[in-house]
Amino acid sequence: MPSRPQTVFRAKVATTTVDLREAPFRRDRATWTRPDDYTGCQHFGVAAREAGIGAVRYESVRDPLHGGCHAVLSPRAFARPAPIEQQTWMLSVSRDRVVWQRTHALKPEEHEFPASLWTRPS
């Protein structure tokens, strides 16, 4: 697959947030961390929106280090009308590898992952 540009951004969020990594939600960790079934997360997202929650913190399912992620559920969650920072990254996907590349004169970056992190287990 040819490289495709992706815009990533950093923004300030000011809203009611729940963290699935903390009690009482952590007891259902198996529901939130299934790489092949998002049903539990989708049901939680619907309930969170209905309860007026603006964002959800959770652990990455595919990051081997289980880094934190932030899902914004409403545009009202953003504290400012514009992002603090934007970057353009090139995404390349092959059968075996996923590569993110950022070409920047002062700070070029590249992150490469095995595609198996995104495939369903057999």
Placement of each model-derived feature along the sequence:
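Active-site and NAD+-binding cores of ADP-ribose-processing enzymes
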Residues: 1-122
